[in-house]
């Protein structure tokens, strides 16, 4: 055993809403920390050796799918990208992300929320003419393509939603993910909608005007999307539409 090896404590909020006898409670697990150990590795060791009933989500293990997002010491993070060594005390408290339907323990249903958001902001390219999918898409300038790609890097992990104070007060608020998605299509020349069209979708208190600019979303996004500037640009464009009415 290495002299530098330490024992860490992982506290998990456990609860199964589908069980008539389950009650929310914290359960502690102790395990030996290994070099470069992530929370994903720790949780898998816990489930394999201590608690096979522990529920959490994962797919890619590389910070690409967003499935393993959870509250880590009160802050939303990706378990697969969070090193246990970054917590000096060695005590790590894990809870499911708020604002999403709880499935069990650390597992929440982000899929239904993002599907509903996708429909609300109509996040697909709108064309006034029927699109011939057998022909190449209309070309765009490299700068535009880069701007669209930058906003399109969202992995739908839900960290921005879980950290949003407005979302906790307004259940129907589309959050940074929704506003970023709207902005992504506003700057895409393949989408033929104008600002008035987007105003009908996000120009209210459940949309961009409900944002209190706390910018927790910007601070917690694991992909470091430019959410602050994206939301500010969207708000300015929607304000111009609102003033013209």
From Swiss-Prot:
Entry coiled-coil feature ranges: none
One of the record's GO molecular function terms: 3 iron, 4 sulfur cluster binding
Keywords per UniProt: 2Fe-2S, 3Fe-4S, 4Fe-4S, Electron transport, Iron, Iron-sulfur, Metal-binding, Oxidoreductase, Transport, Tricarboxylic acid cycle
Keyword Transferase appears in the UniProt entry: no
Domain 4Fe-4S ferredoxin-type: 145-174
Binding site for [3Fe-4S] cluster: 164, 211, 217
Subunit structure: Part of an enzyme complex containing three subunits: a flavoprotein (frdA), an iron-sulfur protein (frdB), and diheme cytochrome b (frdC).
The protein's name: Fumarate reductase iron-sulfur subunit
């Amino acid at each position: 055993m290495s002299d530098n090896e330490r024992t860490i404590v992982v506290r998990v909020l456990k609860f199964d809403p589908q069980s008539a006898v389950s009650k929310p409670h914290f359960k502690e697990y102790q395990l030996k920390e290994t070099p470069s150990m992530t929370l994903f590795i720790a949780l898998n060791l816990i489930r394999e050796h201590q608690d096979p009933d522990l529920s959490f989500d994962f797919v890619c293990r590389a910070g690409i799918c967003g499935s393993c997002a959870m509250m880590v010491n009160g802050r939303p993070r990706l378990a697969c990208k969070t090193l246990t060594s970054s917590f000096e005390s060695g005590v790590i408290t894990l809870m499911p992300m708020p604002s999403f339907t709880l499935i069990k323990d650390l597992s929440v249903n982000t899929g239904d929320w993002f599907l509903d958001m996708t429909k609300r902001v109509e996040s697909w390219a709108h064309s006034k003419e029927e699109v011939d999918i057998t022909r190449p898409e209309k070309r765009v300038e490299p700068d535009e393509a880069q701007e669209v790609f930058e906003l399109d890097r969202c992995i739908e992990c839900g960290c921005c939603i879980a950290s949003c104070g407005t979302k906790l007060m307004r259940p129907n608020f589309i959050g940074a993910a929704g506003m970023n998605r709207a902005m992504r299509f506003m700057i895409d020349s393949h989408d033929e909608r104008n600002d008035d069209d987007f105003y009908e979708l996000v120009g209210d208190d459940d949309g961009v005007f409900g944002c209190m600019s706390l910018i927790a979303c910007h601070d917690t996004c694991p992909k470091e999307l430019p959410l602050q500037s994206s939301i500010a640009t969207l708000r300015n464009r929607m304000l111009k539409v609102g003033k013209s009415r």
